[in-house]
């Protein structure tokens, strides 16, 4: 087994990142989606598939209904998820899963059944020789080259904060909110509706996601930015739709990600903001470790890619933290792949060899072994 390269798969709610242990970046990055035709094929004799996965579904989205098997970090549709894993191994990476140990990732505080079922499918459907399921945020810290810090990981389905001290996560202080990229996309669609631009179908929501990813940023001072947006056209940017129409996006560019910082005011959701989530997680930890955590706030995940988010989080945390503490927010440029890179690093360590759940472990103990071996 040692001579076979480990396959590292970061199953995001929105994007799958997959590749080989020891490499710097994932070889395959594709949307975690399955597209099924809305209508029966009008092209007689043309061989049209009944479903498309990943990039192909994205390209043909105009005639498809788009399904996401993972919602808020939890796998909701196991049949579709199996298809995505199948696509990952055989099409994207071109490997036989029964020849490679596999590392999968998941969000903290997921239902136990989620990781048990993942384990069962990997051993029984894909016959992997060995498996490990790692918590996403812990891997992000590895990729930042640290063993102590608090990770704020915001992806497409879930945002979570995980304090880690000397390599151990502090479970009682871990927190998560169901507010992440996909919710921002829905909110962006709502803001665009105010302007008279209506996006409703699953394919149109993909356009909204693209607008959000390309044009949004986080304002350091939201009120000042709003005032400025009423007085001038500084923030206006054009976006060309697939049909050639051009729409103008103004203050929605920063109103959308503001949802992360003010869920209640922006969209009536009684959820913790990302600054409260981070601050409360730190406060839940022992008083002796808090300073180290404040000095190592690490951002990870695609929803932390907005310009200005690091500076804004720093400002919000500084307002809450004791004055004597020098708060530091670390935002590496390729943090959307931080989880994957951490998995690649972790599995290349010689000390990791004893961590795997082997096929024998699984046959002997069943899927519940995952709770004992993967902490």
UniProtKB/Swiss-Prot annotation:
GO cellular component: cytoplasm; cytoskeleton
One function term, GO molecular function aspect: ATP binding
Principal subcellular localization: cytoplasm
A Pfam family this chain is assigned to: Actin
Function per UniProt: Actins are highly conserved proteins that are involved in various types of cell motility and are ubiquitously expressed in all eukaryotic cells.
Family the UniProt entry places it in: Belongs to the actin family.
The protein, known as: Actin, cytoplasmic
Annotated organism of origin: Sterkiella nova (Ciliate)
